[in-house]
Structures are given as C-alpha cells and as structure tokens.
Amino acid sequence: LSLRSLNVPYLAAHPLELGMRLHDQAAAGADDDEAGASEPAPRLARLLAASPFDAAIHDAAGRLFERSAFQLYDEPSAAPSVDAWFPDGGAIAAVKRILRTAPVREFPATFVVGPGDDGIALVRLLSHWMVRRHYARVKLKLMGLDPEQDARRAAGIARAMDAGGAPRAWMCVDFNGAYPDADSLRTFLEEWRRDHPETYADLQYLEQPTSADSRGGEVDWRSGPPDKPVLLDEGLVGMEAFAEALERGWSGAALKTCKGLSFMLAAAAWATPRGALLTLQDLTNPGRAA
C-alpha cells in the first residue's frame, strides 16, 4: 500500500503538501475576513493554532499506511506549494535527504534562566539542575531593555553558575526580538566579552535579537557581523523571509514544530545544503522526569 496507489481524493496530496497549504493559509491570515475578525490575529498566533492540524495530517497518514509518517518521504511525490524552492528533485526528496535513518533517543536538555531568576534562588536552581541533574546547557532569556545591563546580567548568571559549583556550560541567549537595531547587539556582546570572557567563549548563538514584527531579513548583518551566530526565531514565518534573512547575513534559524511541522521540514531541507546553522527546539518541560 502506497500513497499513490490509494485513490482517495482527500489524500491526493502528500502530507507535506497539505501541511504547506495549511501553513501558507495561516501565515497569510486567509480566514480572518471569513471569521469577521475586527483585526487580523497575530501571524505567530495563527501559525501556532494551525500547527496541531499539520501534525495530525502526518499522524493520520502514518496510521492509514501503518508506518512512520516520515517513511512517506521515501517515495517521490509532488508538493507544488513548496517545490519551487527545490529545483533539484523537489521538496519531498530534499526532506528525505536530511532525515535520519533512525530517531534520536537521547539528546541534551537545556535549563532556561528567565528574566525573574536572580540572587541566591538562582544559585540554588543552577546547582540543582546542573550539578545534581547534570544539565550542561543554559538558555538565557533577556528583556533587551539595555544592552549594557543585559551584559551584566549574563555575566552575573555565569558567576551564579560558578557559585553553585556548576561546570562550564554550553550557552545561548534569546532576546525575543527586543533590541531596536544591530548596534544594540554589538554593544551587548562587547560588554559581556569584556566583563566575563571565560563564559563568553561558551556562548554558542543568539536568537532573534531584533524585532520580528517585520521580516527578519530587514536587519542587515553583512556590514558588521557579530562574532557569534545570529538565528531567526519569531521571524521565521515563511520561506521567503528565511531566504531574505540569509542573504542579509543571518546565520540560520531556530526550528520549532509549533509553527508547523511541514514548514519546519521544508525550511530545514532548504537551509541545510546552504550551510545555515539550525537548532531544533522542543518546548517540553520535563519537570521531575529530568
């Protein structure tokens, strides 16, 4: 039994194609007028609302054919909504090339330090999760109100790790698009490097330092790129935005299936041969299971 051999109208397209149609419709806000909304819903909210249906399409196809939905990428098929981005064999074949032959069963977990985490409580938290639970990665959320203040906070987190006996850790920083321009990020990096060079060396990448209200590519890093990779997060909303961002010096993107499994697969398949840095992020909070 194969996707092509089953002549059922509602399965006439590959799950990737159906998911990309859903993504494009949600990104464009195509249903807002029909729903009589007084103003369009935020684009990220629309993508988030649509994503469970995208996952359900893949899940339903996998159940129908009694195999992993990802095995449906083994067969050549058309995906007209996104094939134009893959002139060398189409999107289905491109996704197939980046899929692992076996799923990853274990991967490093990341401890997230929020804006309100501070003082002795933070020292205890870091000691618990990094020393006792063996977390080796830290994601630092910053408000982005003042780059010098943010740099001091980043260095303070590093000192809290030292005080709690935590080992050197892999680190990343997420600004949620708070900085107004590229110069603010450069100031942040310069101050952190000056204040705490040891942990600055552990900083791996930066997520969405500037606004995602418009296309992420509008900030141009080519004139003076930072010495750390800069990734799209909230700004990753479509293939066009991703392509423009890479042209303007962005390093890659944070992939989250909560914005659509099909789009994330297509984005990863398109970006991988171009050498973009990609991080796959799951928002699960393991709690005591960790």
Predicted regions and their residues:
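Glycine-rich, aromatic-flanked loop segments that form ligand/cofactor-binding clefts
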Residues: 44, 58-65, 69-120
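Glycine-rich, often proline-containing surface loops adjacent to acidic residues and nearby aromatics
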Residues: 105-108, 131-139, 167-172
